[in-house]
């Protein structure tokens, strides 16, 4: 059965609500990968960084700054045209976990 990236992300959010952060992060990363593979014309690319950002925030909430930083840097490098990167918003996240 094929699920959509949004459904995969919703599953991740459900895990997060129940305190299962590792599983939540895994689901959100998978959702981003799924969104990327569906993005033949870059339309879905705007959603993948959002899923990754959620994963990074969850890692941050667990004080796993190193993993969060890796995700934030990946967003900045891979999704240069996303609003998150264009607005320099991602830099705030990178700066926060780099302290």
Tell me what each language-model feature is.
Residues 1-5, 34-48, 76-89:
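Short solvent-exposed coil/turn linkers within tandem alpha-helical repeat scaffolds
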Residues 48-50, 57, 69:
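Long amphipathic all-alpha helical oligomerization modules
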């Amino acid at each position: 059965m094929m699920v959509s990236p949004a459904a995969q992300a919703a599953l991740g959010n459900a895990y997060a609500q129940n305190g299962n952060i590792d599983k939540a992060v895994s689901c959100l990363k998978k959702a981003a990968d799924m969104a990327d593979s569906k993005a033949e014309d870059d339309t879905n690319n705007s959603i993948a960084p959002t899923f990754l950002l959620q994963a990074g925030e969850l890692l941050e909430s667990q004080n796993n700054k190193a993993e969060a930083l890796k995700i934030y840097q990946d967003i900045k490098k891979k999704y240069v045209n996303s609003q998150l990167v264009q607005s320099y918003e991602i830099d705030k996240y990178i700066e926060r976990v780099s302290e």
